[in-house]
Amino acid sequence: MRMARTPFQQGEYMKSIIGLSLLLLLTGCGIRTEVVRVNVPDIRVNPEEGPVVVVGPVRDVRPVYYPEVAAADRAKNLAGVVRQGNGVLVSIESTTAADKTRAIMIQALRNMGYRTADQCETSCTQLEASLTDFSVKMPANFFRMVSSTQQMLADISVQVVARKEGQTRTFTATGHGANIFQVPSRENWEIALERAVKSFTSSLQQSMSEQDATAGSKAQD
């Protein structure tokens, strides 16, 4: 005699059905790769004057999001959604996640009035950055699915070490973006990523402003 499912088991069963249905909607069958464009917002020229900052190469220390991602593709992979052998692996176009992060950081600093340089000739701020997350995902949610409000989510997280004149400060800059979609498409992934980049830019600029204020306060002591 078959035992009746508990409410918890019924909930987990429904989640698996919902997740599989969504993935079949996305891919039909199997795993495919979606290549997305991540834009650097509000591009401006490097200021001729202003405090100098050197952004070193960004270290990619992100986890392996899915074992299905080949080792050669991991530097470009932005996770995606994979369940029960079906899904989408999202990959960044033309460059690596670490290099794109560095480009975003450089532009954010230029927009603050910093002059970015490849090396420090006089007094400057040197930034060492480690990329801990740059990913997209699509959580399975029954209520969102039945109401056609499924979300694509994007997250960026970078640990930064700022050094200037013997002083060291660490902070984490983060960004989050969400996009409610009806049709799973490259464009909808890109909307979530665009919002995460803007959020990350704001977080980095705020942390750098606090860095400047702290450095100025210590200089006056």
State the predicted function of each range:
Residues A79-T96, V161-T214:
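Short secondary-structure boundary motifs at beta->alpha junctions and helix caps
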Residues G30-V40, M112-T168, N179:
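Surface-exposed short loop/turn segments
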Residues R62-Y65, S147-Q151, A196-F200:
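Short alpha-helical linear motifs
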Residues P63-Y66, P139, T168-T170, V183:
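Short acidic, gly/pro-rich beta-turn/loop elements at beta-sheet edges
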Residues M1-C29:
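Sec-dependent bacterial lipoprotein signal peptides
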Residues D99-N111:
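Amphipathic alpha-helical segments
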Residues Q10-S16, A129, V160, A219-D221:
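Intrinsic disorder/low-complexity segments enriched in polar/small residues
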Residues C29-K100, Q206-D221:
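A structural "domain/chain start" motif
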